[in-house]
């Protein structure tokens, strides 16, 4: 069999033609051509597939507790009606009016 020899690749001369050097670009470094990103170690990483997260075992099959929970806020028991100064004053005035009316009706 005949031996096949590969020719060494020649540097791309088209890059130099695309960006002619001018006075503003003479001091700058030439930018690298975009390439495929490589990992730092230089070894190609394996493709990984992500699994869906599953619920903890047994937690979904457990039944809810049998205790009844109230639907809303529990109502507070009504305590004695707190009467302030003005409430007592109104009651006093009502009593006086009632007494006046009774005394007027009894006089007639």
Swiss-Prot record:
Compositional bias ranges of the Basic and acidic residues kind: 93-108
First and last residue of the signal peptide: none
Segments of skewed composition (Polar residues): 58-70
Record field: transmembrane: none
Compositionally biased residues, Basic residues: 26-56, 73-92
Domain of life: Eukaryota
InterPro entries on file: Spermatid_TP (IPR040433)
Region (Disordered), start-end ranges: 1-108
UniProt protein name: Uncharacterized protein CXorf51A
Organism: Homo sapiens
Gene: CXorf51A
């Amino acid at each position: 069999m005949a031996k096949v020899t590969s020719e060494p690749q020649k540097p791309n001369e088209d890059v130099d033609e695309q960006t002619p050097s001018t006075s503003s670009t003479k001091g700058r470094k030439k930018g690298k051509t975009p390439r495929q990103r490589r990992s730092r170690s230089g070894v190609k990483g394996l493709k990984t597939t992500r699994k869906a997260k599953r619920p903890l075992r047994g937690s979904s099959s457990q039944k809810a507790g049998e205790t009844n929970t109230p639907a809303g806020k529990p109502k507070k028991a009504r305590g004695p009606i707190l009467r302030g100064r003005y409430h007592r004053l109104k009651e006093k005035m009502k009593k006086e009016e009632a007494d006046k009316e009774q005394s007027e009706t009894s006089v007639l």
